């Protein structure tokens, strides 16, 4: 096991090269609906159980089925209202199990990035060849369904190996959502040397983390979103920032949670200088306009730190 995967070094937030967004926007805002498929009786993984209770896992399966039956339609209608194109973190198996959901999102020109095949099948314990095949299968399945190859990746159930990002970059991916380390896009060093970026994806604003893990009530969640926006919007006056709201159609789309979520979306989209966009568009813009300056700044800072260390040791 590596001590450090080496994807990114320390790069302080202050005094970085300025990031500019289209139209002079301060903040790039995207919503990432996780549209997933969970199996009732999934294959067992030796490192992680898919369900906290014995199989068949009817309660867990059925609430997620509620999300795909009811919650998705509710959330899609709300995003339509505010002119937000979702960036779907998609379990590729959904293309087979619920192709009608994929078709509805495709009609709206939503982005599809890959979230693995099933959200009950994990990377843990896979060989490199097996993981490569799983990622490739998910990319191919989504491309067949929507006509465009996924540019982004979020590991299924956030399960990773040491080479996950290397493999996705080698297979043609442009960005990862698996590094929760910044509020701006950053370069990611991968073994093949591809131009590859991290696009901010917030665990703090993730509805599952908020509601299930941190036990936050809906009104407080809505206020958290507004507070996060205010901070990032203010910082964006100096250099462009990114705000992502990751959602799940069986969480935020429950009836008692929708009003607070809508109020937050209304607040954000009511501000000027907000680029309402997708993960792919953020990655493509950054790779074209900010990536090289970021690499140069990182190299310069590393050289300065090295020379300072050498001077102290002399």
Sequence positions of predicted segments:
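Positively charged, amphipathic and often flexible ligand-engagement surfaces
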Residues: 185, 199-220, 240
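Catalytic alpha-helical scaffold of carbohydrate-active enzymes acting on polysaccharides/glycoconjugates
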Residues: 1-152, 157-197, 222-245, 251-314
